[in-house]
């Protein structure tokens, strides 16, 4: 009887563990806004200007996305980190906008367009 109990417990334990490399499953769905976190400042893509930005409007690369949270984070208590973005892939460059202070606005390419991200202040 003891060997059967041990086998049963081992099977139960194995079923409860996740295999390395297996996709994670979330019980919580987060509805992300289109943001990028640079340092302690969160920038959000709000309504875009009537005239879309062009390549010539972009200044120097200011930062790069380090981590895409959408599809990878399901903890509603997750604390944003420098380089996090909702929908931009890791490695995406974040640009300064010519004539705009970086503390107010930045830009990035998303879904075939150049979007303006407006500073919302330090993240909590």
Describe the role of every protein-language-model region:
Residues 1-6:
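Bacterial N-terminal signal peptides that target proteins for export
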Residues 13-16:
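C-terminal motif of bacterial Sec signal peptides marking the signal peptidase cleavage site
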Residues 18-20:
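Bacterial signal peptide processing site
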Residues 23, 29-31:
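Transition segment at domain starts
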Residues 31-99:
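Mature extracytoplasmic domains of secretory-pathway proteins
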Residues 52-55, 104-105, 124:
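A short local loop/turn or secondary-structure capping micro-motif enriched for an aromatic residue
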Residues 96-99, 104-112:
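Short, exposed beta-strand-loop hairpins at the edges of beta-sheets
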Residues 107-124:
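C-terminal partner/receptor-binding element of secreted or periplasmic proteins
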